[in-house]
Amino acid sequence: MMKYICLIFCFFALGYMSVEAQTKTALINGTSFTDNEGKVINAHGGGFLKVGNYYYWIGENRKQGVFVSCYRSKDLMNWEFRGDLLTRQSHPELDSANIERPKVIYNLKTKQFVMWMHYEYGRDYSYARAAIATSSDIEKPFTFVKSFRPFGNMSRDCTLYKDQDGSAYFFSSARENYDMMLYKLTDDYTDVKKQIATLWPGGHREAPALVKRGKYYFLMTSGCTGWAPNQAMYAFSKSISGPWSELKNIANSTAFDSQSTFILPLVGNKTTSYLYVGDRWDGKQYFKSGYIFLPLTFENDSTMTLNWRDKISIDVKTGKAK
């Protein structure tokens, strides 16, 4: 009997140890990250949002169709799949749609999570629309609202930003990606209210990612070279509406073979770090694309740098990333 009990104890102990062994203490940059079940994380072109004790990572899932998938984590390294928020079955307008770069913010007035994204219908990029979906629960399926061209402008690569005063803004590439447009959203975040600026007309920039640090907003973008990486650049401004500085190079000539998708502030009890999140695209098999998490550094209030690290360890309690 004692031998039997011992065997049972050993079995559960080994099972516990195997689970513990899977807990990540660092992420290997440039690889396809995996979730807590060992499955590849499909959340490309994604954004992040903290709700309660969890960070949510919402992005493109291209393995079986074109979904918008949701993952959550308490430490930004160990991720749990929570489901698909949008699929081609969610709405008739999505039955042949390609969704890219979904971003989600929360509206305190309407109690809704609001998603904006790049919408295409079919195989090419001729539709060039923005699209919107909403949900009262970040882990539950979103309701598709509409797709449209903001004030008649094309809309491709995009990002969404909620400012400290609750106002929200949408950045997107327009005019065949030659211009970066900036719009202020309506109070419920489900439409554009005003076109604020055309940033760097003719600059041919895409993949916008925005963050505010201190008195300055920083906007990072990439050039337009299809799935091939290129020189990342950034600009800064004391006002989101501008004037914005000239574009400056950051990282190496290929952004370490990645393209920007988000800048995540990591607010801890000792410091605040800012994480660059990029996709390392595989243009032939999108779902095999890798990810890059790197800490941004600031030499002064308006100078931002990005250096390569093979791996990164994140401490959400202290706010340190190294």
Model regions: which residues?
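Carbohydrate-active catalytic/glycan-binding domains of CAZyme proteins
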Residues: A21-K322
